[in-house]
Structure formats: structure tokens, C-alpha cells
Amino acid sequence: MDNDRYDILIAEIRKLNTALERLAGPAPIESDWTSADCFVWAPGRLYLQPVPKPNRVALTLIRGVDRVRDILHENTQRFAEGFPANNVLLWGARGMGKSSLVKAVHEDVRAASGVSLKLVEVHREDISTLPVLLDLVRDTPHRVIVFCDDLSFDHDDTAY
């Protein structure tokens, strides 16, 4: 093969490589699980963004939801210990403390158990990427709680 044909072949291979990389999308960025206990899912970069100082309140400050708090705490404790746990749906009006309760229970169980329990928040608009997120966290040695804040189902919403 002469040099001209060789150069043309190399150029075509490079074009193919560029097209394949574009189709494949971005490679996942390795998440540093040791950097935080709380993360936010960034699906565009296939990355768990650490939240080093999450906005949360102490569990003892949450009042008026004792039964729900106790059930959620027991379920989270079982999950942290490696036992099966139930999925949870907390519902109520905005501002009632649902997310605060989730974050407070996470911190209380994590601190008391010493288990590497991580909390990952998924934004409502990123729910469709849950399978990708679950693939990324499946092989981690950590116990991972995934939660979506302010999930709502509107009459005209066809995304669900």
C-alpha cells in the first residue's frame, strides 16, 4: 500500500473513532465516595456530585411525625445493616419536612451505626436516568439511599 492510501485509511479510521466516541457519550467520571456522605446525581456527566455540607436538621428537632419517623428510621437501620428494606414514599404538602426527615434519618443512622451509608438525591427531571444511576452504584461497597425531592404527578404530565 502506498503512502497516500495509507494516509486516507488512517484519516477514515480517525473519523470513525470520533463518530463512535460521540455516539457512546461521556465516560462516567469516577465518583469519590469518601469525599462526602451525600451526593446529587448529575446524569449529563454520569457523576455523583459530592455535597460536603448538606443542609439538614437534627432528627430530634423534627416534631409531629413520630410514627412516620420511627418507621423510616427502622427501615433505614435495617437497610444499613444489610437486610432488605422497603422503598418509601413520603407524601404531603411542600414544606412539611419530608426531605428534612429523610436527611435527618440518614445522618442519625449513619452516625450511630458506623456503616458507610450514602444518600443520593435525584432531581425530578432526572428520574428517567435512574437505571443508569443504579448501574453505577450497584457495585459499590456502600449502602446507598436514592431519593427524589418534590416528586409530583400532574394531570397533564406524561413523563410518568
Predicted regions and their residues:
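Walker A/P-loop nucleotide-binding motif
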Residues: 82-104
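Pre-Walker A adenine-sensing motif
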Residues: 67-81
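Dynamic helix-loop-helix/coil hinge segments at AAA+ ATPase domain boundaries and subdomain interfaces
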Residues: 7, 47-71
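Phosphate-binding P-loop
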Residues: 51-53, 77-85
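AAA+/P-loop NTPase substrate/partner-engagement loops
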Residues: 108-144, 151-156
